[in-house]
Amino acid sequence: LSARSPQTGIFALGTSSHAYLEFDVVGPHGLELLEAVASLREPRTTMGGINLVAGFRPELWRAAAPDDAPAALEGFNADVTGVDGFTMPATQRDAVLWLSGGAYDVVFDTARAAITALAGLGTVAEETSSWPYLHDRDLTGFVDGSENPTLVEAPGIVLVPEETPGAGGTVLLLQKWTHDAAAWEGLTAAEQEQVIGRTKPDSVELEDKPGTSHVASTDQDQFGHIFRRNMPYGTVTDHGTMFVGFASERRPLEAMLESMAGLASGERDALTNYTTPVSGAYYFVPSIESLLEVSSTTSP
């Protein structure tokens, strides 16, 4: 087997407009939906300047390509329930399309074309649009992704290794977090910094950060390294963060969620007092070659 190529949109930084479409299968058409999503791409990696990243519920991918599925990878099939009843809901869907581009009109038109192409096989269960805020900050006003690996490092961290099932693919955790803006903005900047564990202007990690700070709760040296493509979403009155995290296996992502929920320490991430997860799904994002194989081998 020659080396497998990741879907290019995973690492396409700098795009200013994003859409996330999560699909439920219509009736018995799971494999047809998967084939149709894979065929949206064909060999081209961009459509009209749009990056298109396709992922699938792990169990659905395994049904289509059993030899090309990471062992034991499962969807987000059960809520993560932490201390004091705090819950991260499981809202696993069958397929996801993440579109990104330089302007929302082309993202919109491409998303509409994709939905039309999948009509009768999959219905849109969740649709969210995102856009950058103050370059690389989320709607808390803090820099998001300070610990991200560089683009040189990221593939080696988040791609399934060569010569193992799923090579060149990656595991995506997609979660929508809605912010309690009034409560957050009721804090002073110094109080916010204690919640996050970093300085607000320049994102320097605090020496004496609390153990419940977001930085301490999601320490990648402890849980494993991931690559995040988080983006703000929403309106002035209803907004938050799309968590878009990639890893070579599910465990680092899952361990961070469990830590944030307080399952490790008994105390949950202080940030979860101000932001609430409303969705959660794991998707396998296959290599370009794997998508081509599925789109061609299952076609008549």
What are these regions (language model features)?
Residues 1-300:
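Long, histidine/aromatic-enriched segments associated with O2/redox biology
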